């Protein structure tokens, strides 16, 4: 969470206030334009999204005294969370904004390079779905795999299609759940034999 402070005041007297929405607009444009290409060729480029902005009292005649901003960053192993923090805070400082930041890293990216678990998953998916060209991808959302990977364990994520992920009426078909159950069972069987 980033808090950008201004000075609250009456909208009719802007010279007695400092609107953080106005003072931060150029910095926000620079922040959303940040780019971090993946250098490994195994991950999508890192992305930054503004997920929440809150400012104001709700009254139309009051200049807000603070703007709160939440960012969501999906980054590849080509950069670190500190790289993102330094870039964002550098922009805020460049624009001389009065800010405080409380950063939370929801999990570092990971990549399983061992083929044992990967091959078991690919074979199981092909066996259950009949799809022989299984796409391996590091794109997508954050999962609990980020907590397991640092232990040194192999991590492979197999899940449903995500065409409605985080949308209104998010849903997964029963058929997909049944196929996943069968795939998981086959992966376990292959690993135990």
Show which residues each predicted segment covers.
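Metal-dependent amide/peptide-bond hydrolase catalytic core
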Residues: 1-193
């Amino acid at each position: 969470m980033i808090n950008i402070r201004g000075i609250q005041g009456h909208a009719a007297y802007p010279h007695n206030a400092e609107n953080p929405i106005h003072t931060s607009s150029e910095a926000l444009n620079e922040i959303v334009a940040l780019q971090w290409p993946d250098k490994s060729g195994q991950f999508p480029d890192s992305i930054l999204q503004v997920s929440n902005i809150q400012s104001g009292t709700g009254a139309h005649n009051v200049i807000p005294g603070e703007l709160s901003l939440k960012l969501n960053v999906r980054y590849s192993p080509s950069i670190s969370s500190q790289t993102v923090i330094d870039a964002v805070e550098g922009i805020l400082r460049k624009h001389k904004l009065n800010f405080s930041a409380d950063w939370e890293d929801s999990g570092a990216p990971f990549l399983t390079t061992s083929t044992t678990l990967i091959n078991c998953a690919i074979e199981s998916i092909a066996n259950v779905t009949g799809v022989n060209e299984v796409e391996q991808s590091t794109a997508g959302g954050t999962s609990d795999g980020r907590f397991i990977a640092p232990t040194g364990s192999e991590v492979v994520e197999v899940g449903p299609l995500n065409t409605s992920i985080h949308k209104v009426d998010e849903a997964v078909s029963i058929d997909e759940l049944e196929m996943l159950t069968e795939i998981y069972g086959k992966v376990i069987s292959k690993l135990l034999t």
